[in-house]
């Protein structure tokens, strides 16, 4: 598959050929379910001309049916472009196909999608990760040059790691969220999934920057990174020892091999611990579900999307939501409503916000001593479908990614090794706020070390 770096240099006629070849390949691999069009046996959405970029189904593309993979949004057609889509089009890139995801980005496997699950290209019996599982699977399988996803608690990084791709979550506020179907507004961030660090930097440069339409968008000057990538920078890297030691043996062994390579390459390695990740889990699921219960209250059958047959307004609300939302979305909305309710707000929500401030401070203290933090992406390689059927077990699969969202920091996942079954193991690199260049340089250097370049 051609790289994004090379694709943007193609002539118009070559881009047309590339798009046709991709369409044919997508049709031939329908069983993967990376695109909604594969799951619904329909033609790929491709009416915009340019270098094709796969788009997660919660990012608005004008005149496309954008549903966040939920039954409740069936029939909705986006009346406008998300800011990131406008930036793609301006740069000569174009949205190409709607990638599958967990319903409203709530999940880690794509199994909660209304359309059906996506298979992991490395092993069809295993999950691709989530919620951006379709984007990661499409890139991994060569069905996309690159893709956009969204990351609320690891939803770009975890599927990228499970499928063997590079997944980059920028600093919160660096990329506009205007036009992103909101799950948790203080945590959500759009970012790229690609096959290389260089392509991730290129796509990030295109979509980043201030947007007056997004009140949380930073107005700091956005400096390009891809033209400054430096794999030879010597950095101080803090290895989060208790997180590495807490991962599976395969992940642990692979990451310590990576640490040895980084030492040999001249990087300064220090070892640090973070507080027990159970605090991250508790704070994240209180804050995220509280914000989700507010964000998803707009889906009531009145303004847009699916409306259930009913005899009264109250019945319409309850039936529309009961029939339109999946089990996991209902679970999180109920939890969010509970923690915001009178009598529990102080006990849960306020405490969670205090815990979030503590978690952010912990990350900042380590990053005052180091340029980069290194830790696992997930406790293990991609697991089999149905293996984590208990919701709590599934939530714990995100223990190494959610703290980054709570702290609002940039982070990237880089494939470093395959296990004996051919499943990918990735390292997660985290940098200080607004220091995307540090993160991308570290990732670029690690990628070259791993490949032996």
UniProtKB/Swiss-Prot annotation:
Its EC number is 6.3.5.7. The keyword ATP-binding applies. The active site is at 56 (charge relay system), 131 (charge relay system), 155 (acyl-ester intermediate). GO terms for cellular component: glutamyl-tRNA(Gln) amidotransferase complex. Keywords: ATP-binding, Ligase, Nucleotide-binding, Protein biosynthesis. Pfam families: Amidase. One of its GO terms (biological process) is translation. It comes from the Bacteria. It catalyses: L-glutamyl-tRNA(Gln) + L-glutamine + ATP + H2O = L-glutaminyl-tRNA(Gln) + L-glutamate + ADP + phosphate + H(+). PROSITE patterns: AMIDASES. GO terms for molecular function: ATP binding; glutaminyl-tRNA synthase (glutamine-hydrolyzing) activity. The keyword Nucleotide-binding applies. Belongs to the amidase family. GatA subfamily. Allows the formation of correctly charged Gln-tRNA(Gln) through the transamidation of misacylated Glu-tRNA(Gln) in organisms which lack glutaminyl-tRNA synthetase. The reaction takes place in the presence of glutamine and ATP through an activated gamma-phospho-Glu-tRNA(Gln). Heterotrimer of A, B and C subunits. This is Glutamyl-tRNA(Gln) amidotransferase subunit A. It comes from Campylobacter fetus subsp. fetus (strain 82-40).
């Amino acid at each position: 598959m051609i790289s994004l770096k090379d694709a943007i240099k193609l002539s118009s006629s070559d881009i047309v050929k590339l798009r046709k070849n991709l369409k044919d390949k997508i049709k031939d691999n329908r069983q993967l379910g990376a695109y909604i069009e594969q799951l619904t046996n329909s033609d790929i959405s491709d009416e915009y001309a340019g270098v094709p970029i796969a788009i997660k189904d919660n990012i608005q593309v004008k005149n496309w049916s954008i549903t966040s993979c939920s039954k409740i949004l069936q029939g909705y057609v986006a009346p406008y472009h998300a800011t990131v889509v406008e930036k793609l089009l301006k740069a000569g890139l174009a949205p190409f196909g709607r990638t599958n995801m967990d319903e409203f980005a709530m999940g880690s496997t794509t199994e909660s999608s209304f359309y059906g699950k996506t298979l992991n290209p490395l092993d069809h019996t295993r999950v691709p990760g989530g919620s951006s599982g379709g984007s990661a699977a499409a890139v991994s399988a060569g069905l996309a040059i690159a893709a956009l996803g969204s990351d609320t608690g690891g939803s770009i990084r975890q599927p990228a790691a499970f499928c063997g791709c590079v997944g980059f979550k920028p600093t919160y506020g660096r990329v506009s969220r205007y036009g992103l179907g909101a799950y948790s507004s203080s945590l959500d961030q759009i970012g790229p999934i690609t096959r290389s660090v260089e392509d991730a930097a290129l796509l990030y440069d295109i979509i980043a920057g201030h947007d007056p339409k997004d009140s949380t968008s930073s107005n700091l000057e956005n400096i390009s990174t891809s033209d400054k990538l430096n794999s030879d920078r010597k950095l101080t890297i803090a290895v989060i020892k208790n997180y590495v030691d807490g991962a599976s043996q395969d992940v642990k062994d692979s990451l310590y091999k990576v640490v040895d390579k980084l030492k040999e390459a001249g990087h300064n390695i220090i070892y640090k611990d973070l507080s027990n990740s159970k605090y991250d889990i508790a704070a994240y699921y209180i804050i995220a579900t509280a914000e989700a219960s507010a964000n998803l209250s707009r889906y009531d059958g009145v303004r847009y999307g699916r409306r259930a047959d009913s005899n009264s307004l109250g019945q319409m609300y309850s039936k529309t939501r009961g029939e339109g939302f999946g089990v996991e979305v209902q679970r999180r909305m109920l939890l969010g409503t509970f923690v915001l309710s009178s009598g529990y707000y102080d006990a849960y929500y306020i405490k969670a916000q205090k815990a979030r401030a503590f978690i952010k401070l912990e990350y900042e203290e380590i990053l005052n001593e180091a340029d980069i933090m290194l830790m696992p992406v997930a406790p293990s390689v991609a697991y089999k479908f149905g293996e984590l059927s208990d919701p709590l077990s599934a939530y714990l699969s995100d223990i190494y990614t959610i703290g980054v969202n709570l702290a609002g920091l940039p982070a990237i996942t880089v494939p470093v090794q395959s296990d004996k079954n051919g499943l990918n193991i990735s390292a997660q690199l985290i940098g200080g706020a607004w220091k995307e260049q540090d993160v991308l340089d570290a990732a670029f250097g690690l990628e070259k070390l791993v490949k032996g370049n």
